[in-house]
């Protein structure tokens, strides 16, 4: 009985909510991390114009299928979407806004690796319309980063975090917990260092 009441009220609330959350997948990476099971691929080169056209065509199709909605969030994931040209990011954001409009306070997130090459693009990514970056630190221990197959070291990760905080209104980061042999005290030290 309580479940039926709960389902009816949730269903009514969902029917009244015309918001839309978009996920945009960029499947390319510079290298494949050994722990990653996401749809991601290492490629020497990517036809950027072809991918941009495909993303915009897919977005236009979805806009026709889902009219009358407002975008509450866009999440660029991957792969490594910080490798996406900022012009493509801006084009997708612009097409989404033109198709649906944005809800107040729309959050537009892009996942990024903390390599210095990618961190140097944070200003351009923010100018494209991204207001939150999710930084894949994964660890703040150089031996753990090597074990995880990451391309950056601790210092580069912390510099990228600082750069991200200067470029974006909102920043989050990933730290992998319960790595083989990791003690709780080590996790706490890494977390405290990232939050400092």
Language model feature labels by segment:
Residues 25-40:
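Local cysteine-cluster metal-coordination motifs and their immediate loop/turn environment
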Residues 1-22, 67-69:
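N-terminal [4Fe-4S]-dependent radical SAM core
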Residues 16, 26-27, 163-165:
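Short glycine/proline-enriched loop/turn "hinge" motifs that connect secondary-structure elements
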Residues 40-65, 69-196:
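Conserved non-cysteine loop/helix-boundary elements of the Radical SAM core domain that shape
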Residues 23-25, 77-78:
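Residues at the beta-strand->loop junction immediately N-terminal to the Walker
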Residues 17-19, 33, 71, 105:
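Sequence-level motif detector for i,i+2 pairs with an aromatic at +2
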């Amino acid at each position: 009985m309580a479940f039926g009441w709960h389902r009816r009220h949730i269903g009514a609330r969902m029917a009244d909510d015309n918001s839309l959350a978009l996920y945009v997948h960029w499947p390319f990476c510079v290298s494949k991390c050994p722990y990653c099971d996401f749809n991601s691929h290492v490629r020497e080169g990517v036809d950027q114009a072809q991918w941009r056209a495909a993303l915009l065509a897919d977005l236009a199709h979805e806009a026709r299928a889902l009219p009358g909605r407002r975008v509450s969030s866009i999440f660029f994931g991957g792969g490594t979407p910080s490798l996406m040209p900022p012009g493509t990011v801006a084009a997708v954001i612009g097409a989404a806004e033109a198709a649906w409009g944005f809800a107040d306070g729309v959050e537009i997130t892009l996942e990024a690796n903390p390599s210095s090459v990618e961190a140097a693009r944070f200003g351009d990514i923010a100018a494209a319309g991204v207001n939150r970056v999710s930084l894949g630190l994964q660890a703040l221990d150089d031996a753990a980063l090597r074990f995880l197959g990451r391309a950056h070291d601790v210092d580069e990760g912390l510099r990228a975090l600082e750069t991200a905080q200067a470029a974006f209104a909102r920043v989050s980061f990933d730290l992998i917990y319960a790595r083989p042999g990791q003690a709780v005290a080590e996790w706490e030290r890494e977390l405290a260092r990232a939050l400092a």
